[in-house]
Amino acid sequence: MKTINYAAQGLAVFGLAALPLAVHAQASSDDQASPTVELNPMVVTAALAPRTADQSLSSVTVIDEAALRRQDPASITDVLRGQPGVDVTTQGNFGKQSSVFIRGTGSNANVLLIDGIRLRSATTGAASWEFLDPRMFDRAEIVRGPRGSLYGADAVGGVVQLFTPEGEEGSPQPRISVGGGSFETQRYSASLSGAEDGTRYHFAASRFDTEGAPVRRDGDDKGHDNTTGLVRLSHTFDSGAEIGMLALRSKGSTEFDASGPAEDDFVQQVAGIYTELPLTERWTSRLTLSEARDERDTLAPTYSSLFETRTRTAQWKNTLALGQHEVVVGAEYSEDDLGDSQTSGLAFNEESRDNRAVFAQGLLDFQPLTTQLSLRHDDNQAFGEELTGSLALGYELDARHSLRASFGTAFRAPTFNELYFPFVGSSNPDLEAETSETVELGIRGQYDAWFWDLAAYRTEVEDLIALDASFRPVNVNEARIRGAELSAGAEFDGWTLATALTYTDPEDRDTGNRLARRATQGLRLDIDRELGEWSLGASWIAQNHRYNDGANEQRLPGYGIVNLRAGWQLAPMWSLRATVENLTDKEYATAQGADFDLATFESIPFDYINAGRAGFVSVHFGP
């Protein structure tokens, strides 16, 4: 089989794509033309205060509403796949278990936020990305690098934050979408949003239903359905005080394969209320109360289980403006509760734990030098105290180019499965948290019509949790992750281009092997063109091979897929969109499962294959 060097291909494609960008960027600079979409967006996840992308001192990617509409993705993982530093694995197609790796760290070593509220399973430590409907969100921010000093446990590789829409000033704006396509897929969504007299509102609902496709060769179709509702309200008083609330709930089921037909019934929910008070001209105080719920009820041929997490959080954050500088201090209390979680009728040895934290951040501006300094102390009932911190420095070389350097620490909390799983000998209540240190260097160029960003990093992880010879989790391993990311984007004359190249070297220092399920090379190229009433676009996503296991014996080949999209503005309020996924009908797998042969007592691996070529069409009403 011919081996494809995806990095070499990517560099060639990047060069071809960047050539016209550079030529046009010079022309745009000369005539001061403005891009149709902001290329230097405001980012709120990289720090505890908003900053533009070139001021954030972080490696960050923003996916705005326009990009989400163009791609019209079926899942959030479709949006994240191939973004700089991001690797996604799935156990099949729609609604099947998915893992997101950021900068080579584990799927339970990154954080998912929805409008600032964290969502995850405390039993696995990871988020259920596969159950999130992308039509509920109008923006995504991906911040790469440690953020433990801002967000606490598990922010080792990075943070992904999804934002729900806010109502815009004016009369109510309805939106309706109806669509369907391959695998007997049906999608419906509707929303109503607006703002008047200081009150903003957004209401939305969606339904996704599909018969699905096989998740293994010669297997049966595995279906999925998901119903989601969203309410977001806020009011700003004449004094500047603000109150608001958010409620997002998804409920559905997904079929999968576990040595026979199996099904998950799931519920995902986030809810929160907040108040923000301008106590003085320089001091703003914000109090947030929230609850996140992740529930998965599984029925399989050989077992049944219920895993439920309720995380309740109270956070008090204070922002002080001191001239061109800014200081943030706060405190946070959270509690994880497993409720009625059990597997095969056995309950967990412990069902709850709490965490108390205090944090502080300083954003210091001494142009052309800027500094971000942060510190956080966590005291967890289960594994004790952890102190994390970070220091980032930025230097403006000129009006268009800036350098950045940072050092940060983070930790991954042991999960309830690792600490208290009910099967004898399969858990360890004496586990300590995994700890990490990361050094990063970056340089960014920001122009009128395009940008580029290059970053290199090194992460050292200690006390990595792994299974010993008796399959009991222990703190034994160390890992070293080295990598580099190159990204660029442009907007000109109706063209929108974005490209990302990723190199990651995630090594288990004890064995010298690559960490499981991580690719080392990745490429993503998005090209879109507006032609009056029409729009056309394509994405190319490619990755090299990976290993399903830590022993590096189960090799999964690399792949490259092409997705196409088109849109037609039928009337001012009506549009038609069509997408083709996996144009070349490439069969590929990013994860494996295993069957157990009772006759030979052997484990027989099989590939979780992704869906083949698929087409979808949808009609949209609204602005």
Predicted regions and their residues:
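Outer-membrane beta-barrel signature, preferentially recognizing the C-terminal barrel domain
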Residues: 260-278, 307-310, 353, 382, ...
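C-terminal beta-signal and adjacent terminal beta-strands/loops
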Residues: 462, 568-623
